[in-house]
Amino acid sequence: MKAFGKSLSVLCLAWLLALAGSVGGASSALAAAPKITLPGKNVDAATTAKLPSKAVPPPKPVLVPPAGNLVIIGGGLRADNAEVWQRIVSLAGGKGARIAVFGMASVNPEKSGQSIINKLNQYGAQAFFVPLGVTLPNSDYRKAAEDPEIVALIHSATGIYFAGGDQARITQALVRQNGHRTAALEAIWDVYRDGGVIAGSSAGAAIMSTTMFYDAKPVLDMLKMGVNDGKEIAPGLGFIGDDVFVDQHLLVRGRFARMIPVMLKKGYQIGLGIDENSAMVVDSRRDVEIIGYSGALLIDLSSAITDRGVKGFNISNAAISYLDRGDKFNLVTRAFTPSPDKADNKLDPNQPDMREPVFTNDILGNNAVLDLMGNLIDNAQQEAIGIAFGNPRDPYPDLGFEFRFSKTVNSVGYSSTEAEAYSVLKLRLDIRPIQLQQPLYRYK
């Protein structure tokens, strides 16, 4: 599989370069290593080539899409979640597949890595530990990341697994101080380009987009005080591409709300947030399939606007969807395919199951947004409201936020014939700041 993927990539690249003409010395896509600026690191100006002031910019290198797959896990993956574990092993080549396990996000990489190895091997893999990590005892992680033996070890794999922990440790170990990829990271990309699978859970999911959460504040504080490069967010490794933002632990921790200010700041139109014990499988055609226990939220800001005249974070006309297990979504065409148990059970807006108003006073609570969306899509009501506010002792205790969800002509729902579950597409979402009375309540 690796040889075939590599040959196909080279042939595609040669054909595209022939059509484009001479590239004037532009780097090959397979060798290109975009610079990543790490928080708190100053890149030497000498590492950046300068063009003459009147030079014609060189053509961009032709990018060949990776032939592999991503398995983006929302954290909390149980050992008995056979659907996810088996999919990772299958995408790596099936029984006996060699999967390189990186425990570098953990304080104890070896312990974390061995736990993952045991689970992968239980499902038929031949997983092995890669001795690379900032916190790995008696090891220089910078030398290890350039070590030819470690690079060869990675190249011997058809799958990669990043365990959970602190995602900053992953990028610190795999990205040079000048912002370029280490030899180990290039080898990981080679596995992916040649048709292998990259899986990651929690912190291992956070690194999948070009921007990741770094030292993030609580969700509500992020809405109140904003996000800053090098603090709340930093560069990720970008396996999913530069047009999709990824987050994890989503429904359990109400993290959908923190995705939106980051997407606005960094210019993302599409964001995907996956819940715990669940995974998004992204293939080379950019089809996303939801597997596991729960689902994912899809946030679309392509038509969203903000009002600069309003003091505080706000957004109007965002679109939010819930993709349940078994659902599929294409990141290129934006086409949605419901799971087989929902395919013939599209909700009729003229025959809603519920009629009562939908409201929650804790929209950031565990699964609160999913419950609200499911109640609204099968309801005679046209909108639902959730609010978020903090502890009276928190910063800005009188500042809260209203989340208004409303149905539009594009809103669609599907109901499962096998379980009490919904897929919900394209609800409108407006968020605006509200002022809370202080104290919030009084004794009688």
Label the model's feature ranges.
Residues 34-96, 107-114, 120-122, 134, ...:
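C-terminal and late-domain segments of enzyme folds
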Residues 25-32:
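Boundary at the C-terminal end of the N-terminal hydrophobic targeting segment
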Residues 149-153, 180-195:
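Catalytic-core regions built around general acid/base machinery
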Residues 106, 112-115, 122-151:
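Functional beta-strand-loop-alpha-helix junction segments that form "active/interaction loops"
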Residues 10-24:
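Bacterial N-terminal signal peptides
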Residues 167-181:
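Glycine/threonine-rich flexible loop motifs
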Residues 161-164, 187-188, 192-213:
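Catalytic nucleophile loop
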